[in-house]
Amino acid sequence: MAAPTSLKQIDLSPLPGKSYFNCEREWREDFIYFLMTDRFQDSAARVPVTGAARSVGVATGNSFYGGTIRGVTNNLAYIAGLGCTAIWLSPVLEANSYHGYDINNYLDIDPNFGTKQDLVDLVAAAHGFVKDGEPWPIRIIMDVVINHSGDNWGYPGGFPYYYSGGQRFPFGTWHRTDRPLPVELRNPDYYHRCGEMSNYDTSPENQLGDMDSLKDYENDDDEIGSEVINALIMAFCYWIREADVDGFRMDAVKHMGPVACSRFCSNVREYAYALGKRGFFLFGEVASPTDDLYNSYLGPNTSVQVGDETVFFGLNSVLDFRLAEGVYGDANNAPLPTILKGQNGPQGLFNRLNLQLNRALNRGELGRYLVTFVDNHDSFWQPTGRYANGATDAQVIGAIGFILCSLGTPCIYYGTEQGFSGSGGDIQMREAMFDTTNTTSLLNTGCTIYQEIAKIAAVMRAQEPLRFGRMYYREISGDAVNFGMPFGSEYTLALSRMLYSVEVLVAYNVSGAARTDSVIVDATLYAPGSTMTYLYGGTGTVTVQTAASGACFVTLPLAGYQFVVLG
């Protein structure tokens, strides 16, 4: 059956006889695997490389390389084996480029990636996946783009126009007579037509301008804006109906009109509920150095004022760029990757948690559902490339261990588990996990990094405090007498996750040299002489001791970059 070309051809009633998937697991329990569809795996039968060593990703260039949806389906065991319970697919709808963020057809799958049936099959296989004889349902998240379209039309003369004080330029010509789809989007008034923006953090330019050649939708609070967002709502609800996907990662949310974002989230959430999908997850890309901006986007009950209107953005979560990217030039708010590599002190982590705890007095969402990561597919915030670039295996393991065991919903970028270390730009950090010139793949389950991440993920899955608990950074001491929060570049970074009467202690030596530090634990939970058991990274137990001050502590001898979990 041919794909629809108009919204008038879309039926959003439930598929006859279809029982839609509703996972009871909370999203903060999940471990998300983010993959670039074109770069993960193709549909060929391949033999994974073996051995404990890390791999170098395959260079691919800036065009379609061959990855497919079927390649994901065929390798669900690899993703589940890592401990992941959700997959975030880069955009799979028909687009002008391999990355998919420049959509030209919202109603069909890009033929480079496969077919609608391939997506349906992937979701069904993921929902029904069995690991070690037990159900292991994997959620599938679609990456959706509603702020802008692809480069589907041009300005007069065929050359770039640039933002100039909000001036609206004339429409030029469509690049194709049969795109974009649905046909309703072939309305020049549906686009702001203000030219390419230069300032991505300055309003109103960052909500009116095009992102390079990608054309910005008119998503204002007016009649045209309502028509545009309603069209996009229908288009993406179509994919919930047809494929039973479990969530949307919303691209470039910061550049959308707030009313449009609110309407999209509210309508999509209601539609998912109507199908029985109670836990549909909506998280957005808000590249921002401030938690206050994040705060305004989170939760269907969180509102902001837009003029005389009260607007509820309605996102469940945002990607935690504030943690990963930090604040440029501010050592007290350093990027997480530089902290975990010992290049900056940890004060930024402590400051941020204190701010989050203060905000939680009024609302509890921030930090609960933030999607945390140490690297991804965009180079604009990663001047040194992927996290593994210049990092040892142990440092990569420690970094992913940190996001697995700290607040938030952890997300790993494909290839990190194999030590991919691309740097220099987007293309270099979007390596392939297969080589079209041979029959092997880089899905190596014997790689040390892969295996150790899987072990930590298993601990996270088994220990409820690591999924639901409160979090506190812990004071340390080199002499078991004088305790304080660590500083500098050589220290043990320690945190506790607390859930009712259970504490799980996480510690990571951020330096390459062995060190022994004593770490505070909760004195109300441990009697002197009691023990904590290694859950990961060590064997046996450590004894709880009491300082002269009455504080309880354990002493941890750690090798360089050693990561441990105790409970």
What is each of the regions a protein language model found here?
Residues 2, 7, 127, 148, ...:
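Active-site-proximal helices and loops of the catalytic beta/alpha 8
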Residues 31, 545-567:
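C-terminal beta-strand-rich structural cap/linker in extracellular carbohydrate-active enzymes
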Residues 533-551:
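Solvent-exposed beta-strand/loop surfaces of large extracellular or lumenal domains
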Residues 18, 24-30, 38-85, 91-243, ...:
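Substrate-binding/active-site clefts of carbohydrate-active enzymes
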Residues 36-39, 93, 110-113, 146, ...:
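Short, flexible loop/turn elements at secondary-structure junctions
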Residues 85-87, 246, 410:
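Short acidic/polar active-site loop segments enriched in Thr and Asp
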Residues 1-19:
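Short coil-to-helix leader/linker segments, especially the first N-terminal amphipathic alpha-helix
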Residues 36, 89, 252, 414-416:
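A secondary-structure boundary/capping signal
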